Amino acid sequence: MVAEVKDGRIEFLSGNPNAPGMKTSLCARGVAGKALVEDDERLQQPLIRNGERGEGKWRAVSWEEALDYTAEKLKASIDQYGARSIALSDRGGPFRDFHRAFLRGLGSPNYCNHDSSCARNVHHANQSLTGLGRKDVAYDFKSARHVVLQLRNVFESIAVQEVNDLTDALDNGCKLTVIDIRASISATKADRFFLIRPGADYAFNLAVIHELLEKDLYDKAYADRYIQDLDALKAFAAQYTPAWAEAETGISASRITRFVEALAQDMPSVIWHPGWMTARYTNSFYICRSIYIINALLGSFGAKGGLPHVSKVGDVGRKDLKTFQELFPKPEEKRADGAGWLYPHFEQGPGLAHLLYKAMETQAPYPVKSYIAFRHDPLMGYPDPDHLKQIFDNLDLLVSITFTWCDTAWYADVVLPLSPYLERESLLGTKNALQPFFFIRRRALEPRFDTRAEWEIFSGLARRLGLDALAYDSIEDIWNFQLEGTGVNIEDFSETGLVNLSDKPRYPDRDNLKFNTPSGKIEIISKKLEDQGLPSLKPYESPARPQEGQFRLTFGRCAKHTQGHTVNNRALYELMDENVLWINDKEAEKLGIEDGDTVTVGRNGHTEKIKARVTEFIHPDGVFVVHGFGHTLPVESRAYGRGLADNRFMQGSLDKWDPAGGAMALQESFVTVKKG
């Protein structure tokens, strides 16, 4: 992003034209950065709770007092329960190294990101098949001939480069297929749209695999070279015909067959996107895995216009940024969430936050008593917030580090206000890509209020807890530490904000692909899964259908908001001030509901009101809302009481998760809808 500033105020914001695919574009959230900075309702100074949790009574304090208080509480937790009693979660991203180093320096293994409520299934699915993480392959949209979006809504859940690259591809003749329970904005741009029954995606994908194999439409030469256990896949898929899938999905066998034939014509430059937010159903892991299998059968892995392996910094003969985590030994303690030991098929790195919360509740395998939520709002992002509050009541310390009010901050003991991104600088970042690069974020403005950057907050805590290696006074010293040995200096970022590490994009040699599996191939049968008693190829089980008068509650994103973080932003509020309930027109007619009517949604005694959007373009089994609304904090005058919060209808869902992929199953709740 480029910010034009005059007299201490933002004049104009645009995308960085030097960043790949940006073309100076910004999404609505990016443009609304000016409104965020100018918002008087955002957090303005550190706060310490002065009443019961969630009561909204606060004592405004100095940074010295806030950091002293937090450090004393953390030290007390370490003294009584050990360093493993401290946990920290975030929303991921490229700037995590410093606060992860802080946690490691204390001696705790309990770092989690939000991914068990987002993309953990797709990550583990790729690992189980290719040994690669979800970010180890690129989506080469710009060169693709056919793109399939099933668990991804590119044109509403926006990454600007993806939108621009896919738009360019469509302009150049690329075909787009969308599979969804509703007609999203992405569906309006599609050549083919399949309106699928909620939860039946796996059936559709198995039928595609069946057709590719049964009719020899797959890339045989590629499969012979790179795919292991193909015979097992053929035997498994034999029963899952398009005719069988028609009864499960509501999509005709003939349409499935024609679609598969079209895919085969465009291989290997095909991208069947494996998904982004895949914490939806109890079989979402296998939906994601089946997508990766289809990509493998089409030869898309490693292909231009498909899923080429990204280049990491070392792959292009350069040295990566030095990390602060390397300053401290890896904690020997087992993770509280069980990732890597109780569940050896799960990657340890970002953990599984819902299982961390279970450990807070049960005190097993040991007590977790202090929790820092950094740019993370689990009370909005995870199901059943009332249950989660009961779990948080077991904590001795709950700290929220956030740039704006959120439910978790409102329930916290300490709130440490983070400067908005235009008012803070961050660590240098690395982008692994076809052409990898380093990038920098500098502050465009000095903070309006008494807020701080993340490095300032964690440096302050580190200094108080004896972690002198993290006690920095300037961001320049941090940047210089990171750049040691890279051959790059700070001045190299001045003109463009990034430093390319290779002279051009580098595609892998498709004749010499390497996969990070024991065999070096794509393994249909995963030993890690099988050793845990989990099938690599899971037989299909028909998803539950709603009872009479019920609907499966589904949710997603829109282009105007980022989860619940932006709903109180004045500029974005003016674009979209509340969510609405999508409901099928024929189902609405049965209930006497017309478009725009206020309806009551209910489940297990909990009800909320919302306006109905009556449309033929949603499957009759489901209803849909945009996630992030239904705010109840009086400090948010615009967001307060607007729309419905989907996660409050997911009572009991903290215990609903996919044992193969590790992520939550957030679309396994059924609700009633009535007029009024």
Predicted regions and their residues:
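Flexible, glycine/charged-enriched surface loops at secondary-structure junctions
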Residues: 81-85, 218-223, 269-271, 302-309, ...
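Long, contiguous, secondary-structure-rich segments that constitute the structural scaffold
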Residues: 444, 448, 452-502, 571-581, ...
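N-terminal leader/propeptide and maturation segments of large enzyme subunits in energy/redox metabolism
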Residues: 48-65, 215-253, 372, 443-516, ...
